[in-house]
């Protein structure tokens, strides 16, 4: 599910290239309102760098939980603020000073690269996000640090 038809087109091409059209379903829509998806009907959901863009994270997670079959898996890859002070400082310098300049020059959209670090800083800590997953009903919640804590992979089971 994605709001962007362009992102879905990219996904379709990749799915076709791998011959997975019969196994993967794509829908244009809002992850916080999955009314087009039946309850207990999905085997797995993956989200890469998208949960922090939800307007209401709890609502989005609840919808994902509703659509997953019992035993279904959720895997989320999301940015995070590193816990180590030195790494956090280096990351913040890069994200707030260098990234908007370089990204703005390449894409001509500096605002998008200003939004990115702000949204990362506002995203819940790994502990808090894990608690949010449990609060909507997920079990076997795991959070694994990647790249010195700049990103995390979260796994959860319905």
Provide a role label for each language-model segment.
Residues 77-136, 142:
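C-terminal alpha-helical "lid/dimerization" subdomain adjacent to the S-adenosyl-L-methionine
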Residues 32-45:
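A short acidic, Gly/Pro-enriched loop at the edge of an enzyme's catalytic core
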Residues 43-57, 80:
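A short SAM/SAH-binding and catalytic strip from SAM-dependent methyltransferases
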Residues 1-34:
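Class I SAM-dependent methyltransferase SAM/SAH-binding core
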Residues 27, 46, 75:
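Conserved Rossmann-like nucleotide-binding pocket used by diverse enzymes
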Residues 21-24, 40-41, 71, 140-141:
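Short acidic capping loops at alpha-helix termini that bridge into adjacent secondary structure
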């Amino acid at each position: 599910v994605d709001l962007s038809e362009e992102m879905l087109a990219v996904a379709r091409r990749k799915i076709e290239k791998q011959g997975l059209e019969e196994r993967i379903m794509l829908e244009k829509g809002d992850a916080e309102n999955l009314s087009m998806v039946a309850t207990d009907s999905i085997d797995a959901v993956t989200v890469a760098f998208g949960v922090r863009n939800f307007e209401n994270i709890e609502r989005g997670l609840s919808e994902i939980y509703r659509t997953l079959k019992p035993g279904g898996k959720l895997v989320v890859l999301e940015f995070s603020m590193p816990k180590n002070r030195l790494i956090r400082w280096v990351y913040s310098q890069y994200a707030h000073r260098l990234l908007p300049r370089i990204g703005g020059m390449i894409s001509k959209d500096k605002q998008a690269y200003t939004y990115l670090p702000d949204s990362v800083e506002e995203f819940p800590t790994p502990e808090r996000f894990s608690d949010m997953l449990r609060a909507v009903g997920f079990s076997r919640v795991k959070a694994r640090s990647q790249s010195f804590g700049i990103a995390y992979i979260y796994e959860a089971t319905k």
